[in-house]
Amino acid sequence: MMRIAVIGAGAIGGFYGARLAASGQDVVFIARGATLSALTTNGLRVTGTEDLTLAVQATDDPTEVGPVDVVLMCTKTFQVADAAASYLPALVGPDTLVVTTQNGLQAPFVLADAIGREHVGPGLCRVWTKIAEPGVIDLMGGPQSLVVGTWDNSITPTLTAFRQALRDAGVDTVDTGDIWTALWTKVIHVVPEGAVGALLDAPLGELLGRHLAIFRRCIQEAVAVGRAHGADFPGDIVDQTLAFLSSQDPASTTSFQRDITAGRPSELEAQMGALPGLGDEVGVDTPVCDVIAETLRVRAERDAAA
């Protein structure tokens, strides 16, 4: 049995934490406010394409928990630094692996600055979930996977045990030997999907239909940036990406898109806002992404000022 702390019991942390707890792992949620109250009073529930309710351990004080084997960092990207400073000193021991679940590439680097690369488990999740209400997670179908590695792609006992824990929990995972290419493989679809969807107020099906030209171009630019940064993509990665997206719910949207549409704080600067800068670092032009990022940035500034 692994001791696992989940920071953030929202759409991502709630789902993976519930699966791991239901499979017999020793899981504790670090939460606060209405979410903490709901977890301690009503437990955690997953609804939608499955129905799971279970009593869970939850606290807002990590010193009550102490060092654990694995920490799942399931906050928004812009919350990672504060969460690391507030919670990780009490949770991280000599062999603790802190797994990122955020979209984009920033979270592992933020954690590395806080706790050292040796404790960072870059991860990528694929699951379509949303918060129905505090303590209730709506599973909308699609893949249910979490791929995890280490900073230098080495295999550690903690990583091996956690991968097995995921399998035991019914979560798909792959023993990747190149976690950074795996992360880029997600970046090239989820970042364009969220950004173009937010720009045009369109679900996935419309991006693959009437808006396919701009959507494809955005993906192509992201692929070029990823390749220049060392991602080992196959030659037909753009077509593979579009084929994967075509197999998903055409009504789906990303959490980033929903945040932008609702005028909430978003991961803009960690996702589409970061791509042009990553391109500049390696001499790759991203004209379509530049315009999309700046348009969304202006919209977010106007919403914040309203």
Role assignments for model-derived ranges:
Residues 38, 90-91, 113-119, 134-236:
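Internal alpha-helical scaffold of NAD(P)-dependent oxidoreductase catalytic cores
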Residues 5, 28, 97-99, 147:
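A structural signal for isolated positions on well-ordered beta-strands in alpha/beta enzyme cores
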